[in-house]
């Protein structure tokens, strides 16, 4: 355990940020899983809505620095390709 006051603060901040990042990454995974489930079922209208939702979450997380912007773009592209296969 840290002894210096500033080191203690850094530990607290790191724990908060880690929890925040983990929460957002879980949102991303959940949105992608929901989209893929709908795509598997073949429901085009619902898949389009889930694609928009997943894209929104990816963009927000990239803006917040949770994931890199190129990773967000790559994921969105992959999801769009999946959607285009059923559309």
Curated annotation (Swiss-Prot):
An example Gene Ontology CC term for this record: cytosol
Gene Ontology process terms (BP): translation
Protein name: Small ribosomal subunit protein bS20
Function field: Binds directly to 16S ribosomal RNA.
Swiss-Prot/TrEMBL keywords: Ribonucleoprotein, Ribosomal protein, RNA-binding, rRNA-binding
InterPro entries in UniProt: Ribosomal_bS20, Ribosomal_bS20_sf
HAMAP family found in the cross-reference section: Ribosomal_bS20
GO molecular function, one term: structural constituent of ribosome
Pfam families: Ribosomal_S20p (PF01649)
Keyword Ribosomal protein attached: yes
Family label: Belongs to the bacterial ribosomal protein bS20 family.
Disulfide bonds: none
Gene assigned in the entry: rpsT
């Amino acid at each position: 355990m840290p002894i210096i006051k500033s080191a203690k603060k850094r530990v607290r901040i790191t724990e908060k940020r880690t929890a925040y990042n983990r929460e957002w990454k879980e949102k991303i995974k959940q949105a992608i899983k929901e989209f893929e489930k709908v795509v598997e079922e073949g429901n085009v209208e619902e898949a389009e809505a889930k694609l928009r939702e997943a894209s929104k979450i990816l963009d927000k997380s990239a803006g917040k620095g949770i994931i890199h912007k190129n990773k967000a773009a790559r994921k969105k592209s992959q999801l769009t390709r999946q959607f285009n296969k059923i559309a």
